[in-house]
Amino acid sequence: MSTLPEAKLDVLLAHHAALEAQLMAQVGAEDYVRITRELSELNPLVEAVKSYRQVRDELGEIDELLEDPATEPEMRAMAEAERDALDAHRDELIQQIRIALLPKDAMDERNVMLEIRAGTGGDEASLFAGDLFRMYEKFAALQGWSVEVISASEGTVGGYKEIIAEVKGRGAFAKLKFESGVHRVQRVPDTETQGRIHTSAATVAVLPEVEDVDVDIKQDDLRIETMRAQGAGGQHVNKTESAIRITHLPTGIVVMMQDSRSQHKNRASAMNILRSRIYDAEQQRLDAARSAERKAKVGSGDRSERIRTYNFPQGRVTDHRINLTLYKLPQVIAGEALGELIDALTTEHQAAQLAEQGNAA
């Protein structure tokens, strides 16, 4: 049986009680919002801790009863059955508390920059990129999030060669961060007359939306160019230089934005994307340096890693990182069953974190 850090739990309960006391006092509107939000985050853990301690005390009483030689056989049998049930409940509570105490990703509550790019497979890859975007769009709607397209380059027969969107909602990065990587589709294209299955792919990048304080970008490190926006055939589509291209010289990261007629809006959007990409590149560098450690985690987050296959003829979706197959492809593509994959990935990630803590102990 795993043990819990009782001293840490005492501090947690004391902090929770102090927050409740603050809430009863006269506090300003800003403090009220902050305190109620923190309490809502702590409440499930606090309830689990209280339940765990109650179960622990009840088990202690049962053990005393069982150790008493005067306890009658019928009472002893009832006590042993109750102890077995309480043992199982205690183990569940311990696991729940240990998971809740895991270090939180500082970016988990952030909005997301979602980038989807068609890969190998030509037109079919563009169509698949469109399918993936709609899947995330529908999933976001089910979570109560909003999705705003920042930039889109449409495919010749539909879908997207590339699409960048901002997903706004509490916990968006926590839910979507394991979606980064290569998604592969196997299906018969509408244009295929022989019924042959084609394989194509699209790359998904999920980046947390970062702020100026998260990434230090010096103005001297930027090369900013303005130009006239161009259409699909290369022709200029307006007479003003509203398009923006920003190059971050130290990393070589380039962001081009021309979707708005406003140069100011294009520049703001480009800077938002640039900040997210620079932050992500630094995280990728740090992760590579800890590659041995990350072998125990859910995938590497490597953009070139094939993470999932969508097989339309068989109606299945397979996530290769956790060897999970769901025969619910229509529901996954509709965003309805995507949560099952995300929850399984999160559980696996938490299990790996717990194992690492155990090894470090």
Swiss-Prot record:
GO molecular function: translation release factor activity, codon specific
Name of the protein in its database record: Peptide chain release factor 1
Entry coiled-coil feature ranges: none
Keywords for this protein: Cytoplasm, Methylation, Protein biosynthesis
Superkingdom field: Bacteria
Cell compartment(s), UniProt: Cytoplasm
PROSITE patterns given in the database record: RF_PROK_I
One GO CC term, this protein: cytoplasm
HAMAP family the record matches: Rel_fac_1 (MF_00093)
